[in-house]
């Protein structure tokens, strides 16, 4: 959502859908910039604000939007009612600021729809078993929309964004990136997890689990978007579907760890317990019974990662235990990689020819990701995009 004019525009589009005889649930996020403004205010008072209080604060943005959207619909003759995440029965675990949905009752949403009303639902939020407000993390409104669609068995789920679909790369980085008409859940999940900002990765994961077919489309026009669905046999004809760039990563080197069985498990269990997502892991055997571990984490998790590592290995913390530096991750994704060979060779050759040094590599069945110097990130994305001939209209 943007300003008041954007809310009016959304209301008009909802009216058209409602007038066509559909029951409509509209899941909304905070107005553009509001969440960042609230975070800024909080951190001006306390650089490390309490997670529970942050959840209470940040849900203000969505609650403002649901009320304004309902008012805008009333003004053009559409019966509408707003509902918070708690009123919709979106139950989560206790993890404030990054809660996971455990169940959805739907509250009275079905009754309101049957009564002929449009329901405006606050995205991004739910409530914990002890009744406290929780939030679902950045992009959580996508997850709310997918989850309520699954719970109520909706016929169609449309995700409206500031882009008109899923592209072979970020069009702001690769000018000739092309829009995909469809993409498999797995590919979308890998792209979302690799830096693509179109959708929250947990939302895609939820859609795949409950087989919610959805369309990513633009808020600003009526053009068809990208359908995200279960993999079709024809999708394997395309080896690579897209290239993702994530510049919000840090490379962490943990040095002089005890080189014995269980150390790695101990380290990564502790990081997981701290809610830190880890990727691209490399272990180097050191000397004299010591080993070094290198991995990547989101840049905003560096302080938490360091605190976790130092607390876990206090004896080693007297030396050069923890070092962090910026890194960029470029990933190629495609379900066709399962049945085609040579993808890694082509990727590495393209980067080598351009003089881009690879620091780290990670792979899955349908993804290859490389960690590189951030200064090379955008150039590398364009090079890889061209190497796999993605600059043509994809189907």
Predicted regions and their residues:
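Short phosphate-binding/catalytic loops that engage adenosine nucleotides
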Residues: 22, 78, 212, 276, ...
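Acidic, glycine-rich loop-and-beta core segments that form the ion-binding/anion-interacting portion
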Residues: 173-178, 183-193, 198, 202-250, ...
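A conserved regulatory-domain signal marking ACT and ACT-like small-molecule sensing domains
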Residues: 45, 224-395
């Amino acid at each position: 959502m943007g300003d008041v004019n954007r809310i009016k525009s959304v209301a008009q589009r909802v009216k058209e859908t409602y007038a066509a005889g559909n029951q409509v649930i509209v899941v909304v996020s905070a107005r553009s910039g509001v969440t960042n403004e609230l975070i800024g205010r909080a951190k001006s008072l306390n650089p490390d604000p309490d997670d529970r209080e942050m959840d209470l604060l940040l849900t203000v943005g969505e609650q403002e939007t649901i009320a304004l959207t309902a008012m805008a619909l009333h003004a053009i003759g559409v019966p509408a009612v707003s509902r918070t995440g708690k009123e919709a029965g979106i139950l989560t675990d206790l993890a404030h600021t990054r809660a996971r949905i455990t169940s959805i009752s739907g509250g009275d949403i079905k009754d309101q729809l049957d009564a002929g009303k449009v329901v405006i639902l606050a995205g991004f939020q739910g409530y914990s078993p002890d009744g406290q407000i929780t939030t679902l993390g950045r992009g959580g409104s996508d997850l709310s929309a997918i989850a309520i669609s699954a719970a109520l068995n909706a016929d169609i789920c449309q995700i409206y964004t500031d882009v008109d679909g899923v592209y072979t790369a970020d069009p702001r980085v690769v000018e000739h990136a092309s829009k995909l008409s469809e993409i498999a859940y797995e590919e979308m999940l890998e792209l979302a997890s690799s830096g693509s900002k179109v959708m929250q990765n947990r939302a895609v994961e939820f859609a795949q689990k409950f087989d919610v077919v959805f369309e990513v489309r633009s808020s600003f026009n009526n053009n068809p978007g990208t359908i995200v669905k279960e993999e079709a046999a024809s999708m394997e004809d395309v080896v690579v579907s897209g290239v993702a760039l994530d510049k919000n990563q840090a490379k962490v080197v943990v040095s002089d760890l005890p080189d014995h069985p269980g150390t790695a498990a101990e380290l990564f269990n502790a990081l997981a317990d701290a809610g830190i997502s880890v990727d691209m892991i490399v272990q180097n055997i050191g000397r004299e019974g010591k080993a070094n571990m290198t991995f990547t984490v989101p840049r905003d998790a560096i302080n938490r990662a360091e605190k976790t590592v130092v607390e876990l290995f206090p004896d080693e913390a007297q030396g050069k235990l923890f070092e962090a530096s910026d890194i960029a991750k470029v990933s190629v994704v495609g379900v066709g990689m399962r049945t085609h060979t040579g993808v890694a060779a082509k990727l590495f050759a393209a980067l080598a020819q351009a003089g881009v040094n690879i620091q780290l590599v990670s792979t899955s069945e349908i993804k290859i990701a490389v960690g590189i110097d951030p200064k090379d990130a955008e150039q590398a994305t364009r090079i890889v995009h061209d190497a796999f001939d993605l600059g043509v209209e994809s189907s």
